[in-house]
Amino acid sequence: MSRVIGIDLGTTNSCVAVMEGGEPVVIANAEGSRTTPSMIAFAESGERLVGQQAKRQAVTNPENTLYAIKRLIGRKFETEAVKKDIAISPFKIVKADNSDAWVEVRGQKYSPPEISAMVLQKMKKTAEDYLGEAVTDAVITVPAYFDDSQRQATKDAGKIAGLNVLRIINEPTAAALAYGLDKKKDEKIAVFDLGGGTFDVSILELGEGVFEVKSTNGDTFLGGEDFDQKIIDHIADEFKKDQGIDLRGDKMALQRLKEAGEKAKCELSTSLETDINLPFITADASGPKHLTMKLTRAKLESICAELIAKLEGPCRTALKDAGLSASDIDEVILVGGMTRMPIVQKKVQDIFGKLPNRGVNPDEVVAIGAAIQGGVLRGDVKDVLLLDVTPLSLGIETLGGVLTKLIDKNSTIPCRKSQVFSTAADNQPAVSIHVLQGEREMAADNKTLGNFELSGIPAAPRGVPQIEVTFDIDANGIVHVSAKDLGTGKEQSIRITASSGLSKEEVEKMVREAEAHAADDKKKRELIEAKNQADNLIYQTEKSLTEFGDKIDASEKQKIEEGVAALKKALEGSDADEIKKASDSLMQASHKLAEAVYAKTQGAGAEGGEQPHGEQEAGGAAKGEKVVDADFEEVKDDKK
């Protein structure tokens, strides 16, 4: 089995790790950073920028720079969460044909899995550059509270990126794996994971290589992006109060505010006060306007108080579902960059009654855990058993629009559960199975995962036919449902891809497009390399012509000059093959010139080598009294 990489596909940043010699190693990207911004930009030239390159140009290209796409993955356009994002995003979020939330850039529509796949391709390339071999197998992490359609969409993103996703693993569980791999004692831990866009808390029991998740809870729309937005709103409100101009209407200014807000938030984790300076942020009839203000840690904490308060509920629910109290928890592990905020750490301490453990790197621990899980699946890591859970209950709609649960939340996965139902009317020929996920009593209040029909039921009074519905959740947390008429043995099943997901055909089309784009990238790189080599060849040839042109025939010199002119003309175009051909022709024409350069160099070397020897001989014969070699030798002898 080939190498398995572990990828933490984050809302704000992503990270990749691999097992090396039995130890997980976080891999630095081409820019030398161990995390990569989960950002994609589409330049005017058609070039696609990923990661740090995309982030650097975001201020000047806000409408075509995509970030926090993970918050849209597997979501319908009409949901409240998406509407919130539409109100604050500089890029365009549109409704797809299947009612999903997609994005539109430069007139082209993209699904969130497609955009996420571009980030995954960058992580794949980072790993391949480090390992020196092709990589196809991966373990990808998702927030523990992701529902089925979000998990399926993440798996689709992996497939589009050219990865074989061996396992989808929950982020807090991955962090627990990284924390507890070398721990020998039994303990109960809470993993508090507050990232760029999502919040999860999981309660686990660790012991003898077994990692058992007891419960999980969270909010898939609460994270650093929301804290950033609070800061942006505060800065914009203060500026409006001061200057009477609302910066929210200017996308470029808004992007600058976002960067400044994020920077201020990070600085206030270690400082009590920070300055925000944004010169030339906007202009009016009186001239340009500059934004200068101070932000204190206390002010930041007060404007984010509402978000901090939201962190407590999921923690209390997770403890209750696990049948534990806060005092039963031995360690609290902090995961995600947002846990560096002092107010977040204080909140964790208040909830669990103990100082959180800060022994793991919150930005890298999830990718490390994913790499360890990859090692487990590959057989490199022995004696580790991971027992994860499904975050939400699963069931079907029954008479009266009620949700009848077949699998309760926090059930260990993989798992399988069956229940027998019957018809609601006499002589009913078919039953419609409406599959749902959620905790509410009424079907309409829960998330629809899919619908399918079991037909061909023989005529019978209501309540007589026996329909067995079976739910099967695999180790990725992805649901398969089947319905069987026990009387006839007729069966119908679906693998849930969510009512608003990508079809198999769409995924395959996107895979082909991603491969085509990779081929385009390769062509662009080859063209740049050919141009660089050609530029260098022209420079060296012209330099040599200036110095040694008089050492070759006029006809040879003319051939070379014609070759240089032809190569310069080829450089005006964008055909790598033409440039290579013209470069080869110039190199052929330059052979005589190269010989002249070589001969001159050799001649200079020979003269340089013989000169001291000649002087020494002459000196020895004619200028004996002036030679100091003997004196020098005597001095050396004295020193000895």
UniProtKB/Swiss-Prot annotation:
Region (Disordered): 600-640
Record keyword Phosphoprotein present: yes
Compositional bias of kind Acidic residues: 630-640
Coiled coil: none
A Pfam family hit: HSP70
GO terms of molecular function: ATP binding; ATP-dependent protein folding chaperone; unfolded protein binding
Keywords: ATP-binding, Chaperone, Nucleotide-binding, Phosphoprotein, Stress response
Residue positions, PTM Phosphothreonine: T198
Gene induction: By stress conditions e.g. heat shock.
Origin superkingdom: Bacteria
Functional description taken from the UniProt entry: Acts as a chaperone.
PANTHER family: HEAT SHOCK PROTEIN 70KDA
Family per record: Belongs to the heat shock protein 70 family.
Protein name in UniProt: Chaperone protein DnaK
Organism of this sequence: Citrifermentans bemidjiense (strain ATCC BAA-1014 / DSM 16622 / JCM 12645 / Bem)
UniProt gene name: dnaK
